[in-house]
Design a protein with these regions (language model features):
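Beta-hairpin "wing" of winged helix-turn-helix
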Residues: 53-69
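Amphipathic, soluble alpha-helical interaction motifs
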Residues: 19, 55, 63, 85, ...
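Basic, amphipathic "hinge/linker" alpha-helix immediately C-terminal to the N-terminal HTH DNA-binding motif
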Residues: 65-84
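Aromatic side chains
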Residues: 31, 57, 73, 83-86
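Amphipathic alpha-helical dimerization/coiled-coil segments
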Residues: 1-3, 81-96
Length: 96
Protein backbone atom coordinates (compact mmCIF):
# COMPACT_ATOMS: atom_id res chain seq x y z
CA UNK A 1 0.00 0.00 0.00
CA UNK A 2 1.82 3.13 -1.24
CA UNK A 3 0.18 6.15 0.38
CA UNK A 4 3.01 8.40 -0.80
CA UNK A 5 1.34 8.67 -4.21
CA UNK A 6 -1.74 10.36 -2.73
CA UNK A 7 -1.77 14.12 -3.32
CA UNK A 8 -1.05 15.46 0.17
CA UNK A 9 -2.74 18.76 -0.64
CA UNK A 10 -6.04 16.99 -1.40
CA UNK A 11 -5.65 14.23 1.21
CA UNK A 12 -6.17 16.61 4.15
CA UNK A 13 -9.73 15.96 5.40
CA UNK A 14 -11.18 19.47 4.95
CA UNK A 15 -9.65 19.94 1.50
CA UNK A 16 -10.82 16.49 0.41
CA UNK A 17 -14.34 17.55 1.39
CA UNK A 18 -14.01 20.80 -0.56
CA UNK A 19 -12.66 19.04 -3.65
CA UNK A 20 -15.41 16.39 -3.45
CA UNK A 21 -18.16 19.00 -3.31
CA UNK A 22 -16.68 21.10 -6.10
CA UNK A 23 -16.34 17.99 -8.29
CA UNK A 24 -19.88 16.82 -7.52
CA UNK A 25 -21.66 19.24 -9.84
CA UNK A 26 -21.01 21.39 -12.87
CA UNK A 27 -22.24 24.62 -11.28
CA UNK A 28 -20.07 26.80 -9.12
CA UNK A 29 -20.48 26.69 -5.36
CA UNK A 30 -21.26 29.77 -3.27
CA UNK A 31 -19.03 30.19 -0.20
CA UNK A 32 -22.00 30.04 2.19
CA UNK A 33 -23.23 26.78 0.62
CA UNK A 34 -19.78 25.21 0.98
CA UNK A 35 -19.65 26.41 4.57
CA UNK A 36 -23.06 24.89 5.32
CA UNK A 37 -22.32 21.54 3.68
CA UNK A 38 -18.90 21.19 5.26
CA UNK A 39 -19.91 22.63 8.65
CA UNK A 40 -16.75 24.73 8.83
CA UNK A 41 -16.12 28.20 10.22
CA UNK A 42 -15.52 31.08 7.82
CA UNK A 43 -11.85 31.34 8.79
CA UNK A 44 -11.13 27.63 8.51
CA UNK A 45 -12.90 27.29 5.17
CA UNK A 46 -11.27 30.35 3.59
CA UNK A 47 -7.83 29.11 4.66
CA UNK A 48 -8.34 25.78 2.89
CA UNK A 49 -9.93 27.44 -0.16
CA UNK A 50 -6.93 29.77 -0.49
CA UNK A 51 -4.52 26.84 -0.22
CA UNK A 52 -6.33 25.04 -3.06
CA UNK A 53 -6.61 28.22 -5.12
CA UNK A 54 -2.90 28.99 -4.67
CA UNK A 55 -2.14 25.45 -5.90
CA UNK A 56 -4.21 26.13 -9.03
CA UNK A 57 -6.86 23.54 -8.11
CA UNK A 58 -9.77 25.97 -7.91
CA UNK A 59 -10.73 29.45 -8.93
CA UNK A 60 -13.02 31.99 -7.36
CA UNK A 61 -15.08 34.92 -8.54
CA UNK A 62 -16.74 37.63 -6.48
CA UNK A 63 -20.11 38.73 -7.78
CA UNK A 64 -22.38 41.55 -6.73
CA UNK A 65 -25.99 40.65 -6.29
CA UNK A 66 -28.91 41.44 -4.08
CA UNK A 67 -27.49 42.07 -0.62
CA UNK A 68 -23.90 41.16 0.10
CA UNK A 69 -21.43 40.21 -2.62
CA UNK A 70 -20.92 36.47 -2.98
CA UNK A 71 -17.84 34.45 -3.81
CA UNK A 72 -18.27 31.50 -6.16
CA UNK A 73 -15.82 28.60 -6.38
CA UNK A 74 -15.17 25.94 -9.00
CA UNK A 75 -12.46 23.45 -9.87
CA UNK A 76 -9.97 24.36 -12.56
CA UNK A 77 -9.04 21.79 -15.20
CA UNK A 78 -5.86 21.11 -13.22
CA UNK A 79 -7.91 20.72 -10.04
CA UNK A 80 -10.33 18.28 -11.64
CA UNK A 81 -7.43 16.23 -13.02
CA UNK A 82 -5.65 16.25 -9.66
CA UNK A 83 -8.85 15.05 -7.96
CA UNK A 84 -9.41 12.32 -10.56
CA UNK A 85 -5.78 11.22 -10.17
CA UNK A 86 -6.22 11.20 -6.39
CA UNK A 87 -9.29 8.97 -6.71
CA UNK A 88 -7.47 6.62 -9.11
CA UNK A 89 -4.59 6.20 -6.65
CA UNK A 90 -7.04 5.64 -3.81
CA UNK A 91 -8.90 2.98 -5.81
CA UNK A 92 -5.59 1.27 -6.60
CA UNK A 93 -4.66 1.27 -2.91
CA UNK A 94 -8.06 -0.23 -2.08
CA UNK A 95 -7.57 -2.87 -4.77
CA UNK A 96 -10.46 -1.82 -6.98
Amino acid sequence: MDLSKLDKLIHEKARLGIMSLLASRAERWVFQDLKGELKMSDGNLITHLRTLENAGYLQSEKIDGVGRPQTLYELTKAGRKAFEDYLAVLEKILGR
